[in-house]
Structures are given as C-alpha cells and as structure tokens.
C-alpha cells in the first residue's frame, strides 16, 4: 500500500538513536538544547522550545499568550488540536472560512475584525498541506489590531514564503514532528519565536513550572505540565533535520509530476502554489468537481482496494459532535465544499516517479468507471 505520507527512517537515524540510548542521560539533557539550536538555525529564529507533541506546543503557546476567556479566531480546516488546545487554555474559538487553497481567508478575517475586534485573544492560522498562508497580510492585520498571531505550521517545516522559511513571521509558530510530517521524532512538536520572554514562559510550563534553585532545592512557581521531549527523540530530530531539504526536493518532484499530469483533467482540480511560495508538500490534495462529490466514498474505497492509500483533510472542526454541542450548527460554504471535494493522494520522499505514475493511472482508471451525478 502506498500511503498518503510516510516517514523517512534510514540507517543514519538508527545510528543516532542507538548512540543516544547509550548516553547517561535519556531526557532533560544536552540533546534537547542541541535540537532547539539547530531548529532555530534552520528556520531563522532566535528561540525554540521542543515538546512532546504539536498539541502540547499549541496548548502552551495559547497559555503563554494569556487567552483565557478570550476568543481565538482560527480555521476550521485543520486537525482538531488547533481549536482543542485553545479551549484547553480557557479560550473560546470562532471559525473563519477558507479559500480554495485550504488556507484561512485573510479577507474574511479582516471583515471579522472590522466588525468587532474586542476580546480577541489570538489569531491562529494553519499552513494547509505545507502551503503558507498569506502571512504578510495576516501579520499586518494582527499588528493593526494588536492581536497576537500564532502560525500553526505543523505541515510546513521547510516551506518558504517570499524566500523566507515559514515560521518566522508570527509571534509564535508551531511545528509537528509526527511521523507523517516533514521530519519526525516519533511524536513531538516545537514552538519557535523571536520573543524570548514567551519561549521562556513556555519552557517553564513544559516541565511542571519548576525552577532549580541550588543543590537539591527547587521551586514550583507556576502550575505546569510534563510536556518534555526526550533526548532520544531529540537525537532523531537532529538527524532528521539534516535530511529535510533533500526529502522536500523528492516530494516536490512527485508533486510536480502530478501537477503536469493532472492539468485540465475532467474529474478534479489541484491546488496551485503561487510563485512566491514553496510548499513542503506535506499533502497533495485533489479537489473533486461537484458532480463527483457523491461518489467520493466509492472512489476512496476503490483506491484503497487498488493499493493507493488516500486520506481526507479535513472534516471541518465544527462538524464534530463535541463542537456542535458547544457552538451549535455552523455552515461555512468554502470549508464545507472543500471537505466534500478533497482527497489527499500519496506524495512523499519514499516514492519514485514509477509510484507516482501508478497513482495517476489508477486514479484515472477508477474515475473513468465512476458514474458521475450530482447529489440529491
């Protein structure tokens, strides 16, 4: 089965892990500091805090910004953690509709702020599939209204916006190191920023809110958590980061093949990456035309049966029963239609062009047999 995304683990990773496992200290040691340093250098920021998941990273980012009882404006087209973490931090969430590239619509965000900008604790955006949001425009809005900006760049480590790495322009940016993401530490995440005070706060909360005083003595100055990432995981992350650019090139090769082969086909559209952006290609979404919406489940099952691992990104967060109970029925037209249309097909560094051709041929072969027709 060709999965939609896949980790890259080679002998160099195994060697790095083996060496780390033989060290005296397995957690809370120098590898944590080293991983944070190389991550800062790669992204081009001053400070980083690595954690045991991107969800933990989001939770502490929201908490550090002091958003309790305030509103977080965010996208519905994301893994639920983007909104969940805000709720856990004591905020309310409000969803802003998306554009046809899956990213939050900065014009609709601006309209919401023009309507009422009071009690907004943060704007939290997601670089869908590894393709940057319009971060300059959104950052300008955040500064205009004096609202903190979080860039949930979980998909986008290594992506570029106007020749700069994604993760530099928000007050706090989040990366994920889950196995399907650009690099992996098994599970893991990070917050990066040029704001030392915010990162110091997050580092304090990462480890129970405890500070060392002298010898055996310490003090707990805040109610914190155990969100630490082990030295063993960090050793893997350090080695993974060395391979990232090469792996992104391989992903881009597969995506470029798809872009060319899928041009002007009668079944679906693809997301066009603007020339001032470079996506990490975490996902390769196809967007079925409306006459195929009702056949999506049939197509999904047929592709799996044929050995093409597909996934859907994402069910809008407000469609989960928990959020329906919390917020009531919400309908955002673009997010709803994107969910009806979207399928993520295999695109990762473990593939070659022969694999990509197999995906293309299989996809078209199945679509040719699908009986199109509008729902209802």
What are the functions of these language-model segments?
Residues 33-38, 42-49, 107-110, 122-126, ...:
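PLP-dependent aminotransferase class I/II
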Residues 59-115:
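Conserved PLP-anchoring active-site segment centered on the Schiff-base-forming lysine
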Residues 87, 139, 143, 304:
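Anion (oxyanion) recognition and catalysis
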Residues 84-86, 141, 182, 232:
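Hydrophobic/aromatic ligand-binding patch that stacks against planar heteroaromatic rings
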Residues 25, 29-71, 85-88, 95, ...:
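Phosphate-binding glycine-rich loop
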Residues 1-25, 30, 346:
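N-terminal "arm"/small-domain region of PLP-dependent enzymes with the aminotransferase-like
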Residues 101-185, 190-192, 196-197:
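Active-site phosphate-binding strand-loop segment of PLP-dependent enzymes
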């Amino acid at each position: 089965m060709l999965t939609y995304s896949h980790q890259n683990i080679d002998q160099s990773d195994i060697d790095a892990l083996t060496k780390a496992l033989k060290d005296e200290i397995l957690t809370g040691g120098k590898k944590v500091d080293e991983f944070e340093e190389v991550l800062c250098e790669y992204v081009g920021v001053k400070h980083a805090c690595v954690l045991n998941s991107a969800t933990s990273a989001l939770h502490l980012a929201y908490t550090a910004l002091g958003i309790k009882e305030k509103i977080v404006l965010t996208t519905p087209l994301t893994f639920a953690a983007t909104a969940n973490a805000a709720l856990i931090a004591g905020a309310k969430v409000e969803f802003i509709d998306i554009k046809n590239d899956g990213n939050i619509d900065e014009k609709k965000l601006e309209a919401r702020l023009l309507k009422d900008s009071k009690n907004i604790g943060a704007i939290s955006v997601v670089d869908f599939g590894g393709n940057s949001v319009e971060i300059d425009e959104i950052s300008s809005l955040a500064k205009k209204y004096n609202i903190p900006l979080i860039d949930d760049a979980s998909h986008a480590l290594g992506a570029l916006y106007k020749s700069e790495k994604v993760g530099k322009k928000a007050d706090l940016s989040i990366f994920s190191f889950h196995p399907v993401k650009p690099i992996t530490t098994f599970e893991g995440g990070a917050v990066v920023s040029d704001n030392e005070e915010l990162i110091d706060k997050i580092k304090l909360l990462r480890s129970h809110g405890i500070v060392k005083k002298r010898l055996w003595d310490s003090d707990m100055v805040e109610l914190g958590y155990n969100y630490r990432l082990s030295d063993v995981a960090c050793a893997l992350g350090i080695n993974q980061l060395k391979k990232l650019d090469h792996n992104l090139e391989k992903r881009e090769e597969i995506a470029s093949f798809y872009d060319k082969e899928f041009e002007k086909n009668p079944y679906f559209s693809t997301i066009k990456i603007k020339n001032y952006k470079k996506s990490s290609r975490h996902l390769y979404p196809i967007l079925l035309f409306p006459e195929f919406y009702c056949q999506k489940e049939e197509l999904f099952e047929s592709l799996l049966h044929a050995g093409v691992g597909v996934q859907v990104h994402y069910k809008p967060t407000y469609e989960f029963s928990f959020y329906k109970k919390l917020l009531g029925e919400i309908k955002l037209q673009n997010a709803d239609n994107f969910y009806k249309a979207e399928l993520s097909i295999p695109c990762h560094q473990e593939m070659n062009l022969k694999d990509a051709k197999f995906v293309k041929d299989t996809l078209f072969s199945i679509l040719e047999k699908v009986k199109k027709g509008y729902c209802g």
